[in-house]
Amino acid sequence: IRDVKIKKSFPDTLEIIIIPQQPYAIYNSKIMTIDGTVIGASSMQLDLPIIIDHTNDSQSSMNTMILTSKLLKKIDLDIKKIEIHDSIIKVFTSANILISDRVNYENNLNRLVVTFHDLQKLFKREIKSIDMRYSNGFAIK
């Protein structure tokens, strides 16, 4: 529950309005809401992307998740899990694993979005992982 409003509407009537939290991702085994708030773990089985953050910076992780989701939608990839380390970020998608250094993460994702469909045509087999840590291209498995 994010908020509760209680109003007295008639001499003996109370109006209670409950505003629920909206879960966005699983963050280090807890729930991250759509506004970036981290709340306690849920016993319910939720089908949400997972963020494993070894830097323990929930706000930065939320920003990384939003950026990644926005860019990967352009190439029809869904995020299953993101692992954020001090120097690298690993994104596990519905189809493959993406690896990037943190410093150039946004630039690397943008390069991938521009070239992804060409890579799929060039490699006529399934691409398991794309390492974007190289400034002049990608390492593809």
Give the role of each language-model region.
Residues 103-141:
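Extracytoplasmic/luminal low-complexity segments enriched in Pro/Gly and acidic/polar residues
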